[in-house]
Amino acid sequence: MNKVNILPSDTNIKITLFSEVSVGISANSVLFFAHLCMFFEENRSKPIDLCIAFLSLTQLMLLVTMGLIAADMFMSQGIWDSTTCRSIIYFHRLLRGFNLCAACLLHILWTFTLSPRSSCLTKFKHKSPHHISCAFFSLCVLYMLFSSHLFVLIIATSNLTSDHFMYVTQSCSILPMSYSRTTMFSLVMVTREAFLISLMALFSGYMVTLLWRHKKQVQHLHSTSLSSKSSPQQRATRTILLLMSFFVVLYILDIVIFQSRTKFKDGSMFYSLHIIVSHSYATISPFVFIFSDKRIIKFLGSMSGRIINICLFSDGYGP
């Protein structure tokens, strides 16, 4: 494994990757802080705020670990030992799974929250945040159990040049597996992720169907006094569809690029594209949440006003 040849040589790829990580960390930090504050400050806190906070925190940690991995790819001399490699790479793989679990749980909770009173899902609307937290961490534990084999396969290979290892960073690689074990683990991974994505699609489709029927009923009853302004339910539905469509497209691209990388023996371009695409959702999705929720915009505006007042007061311009 000639790591000099495997490393991406295009400076634009490095800039794109580090920019994606930096922007994603900033956006998820803002989203996490805003929803956490709103959850504790509002008189009637919404469980969905806690779920979005979970998602943003997961994506924040995912991008931080990706930043460490990128630093070892481009700026390190292969100084990580096996313990460091296993800890960081395994934790990064787990966070990718946690991100999928959190996104799936968010879509399900969103459907419960927006369901009309006549829906069979109404009884789930007022579940406490404790139930939401338990569901999230249960999914995470299952993912940890299913991914535990990766901790054994990740080793430090800073001085090895074998073509049998799968390159990860300058310091770390993944040990080769037999065809049967590779097939088995791949089948488990595909089944697990296909199940979660199917749940997301099912609940998103159910929500869209309910809101479409509700819109038809409203048009029938108030055909002469329709407003061109979209309702909060319609805006939420568009957000759900946008996030769901974006997630599925990126997931398909992720699979195609990963398979291409395997076919072309760890080509540097495919490896770089795989990293960028697989972290695009974590970078872009917080902007969708921020700009689709007026509460966050108002909250950020009020926080900016407080910071400006504090700065003016500390400089002696206050009363």
Swiss-Prot record:
Disulfide bond residue pairs: C85-C172
Residue numbers on the Extracellular membrane side: 1-19, 71-93, 156-193, 260-269
Subcellular location field: Cell membrane
Family: Belongs to the G-protein coupled receptor 1 family.
GO molecular function: pheromone receptor activity
Annotated function: Putative pheromone receptor implicated in the regulation of social as well as reproductive behavior.
UniProt topological domain (Cytoplasmic) ranges: 41-49, 115-134, 215-238, 291-319
Membrane topology listed for this record: Multi-pass membrane protein
Keyword presence, Transmembrane helix: yes
Source organism, top-level taxon: Eukaryota
Descriptive protein name: Vomeronasal type-1 receptor 96
The species this protein was found in: Rattus norvegicus (Rat)
GO cellular component terms listed in the entry, alphabetical order: plasma membrane
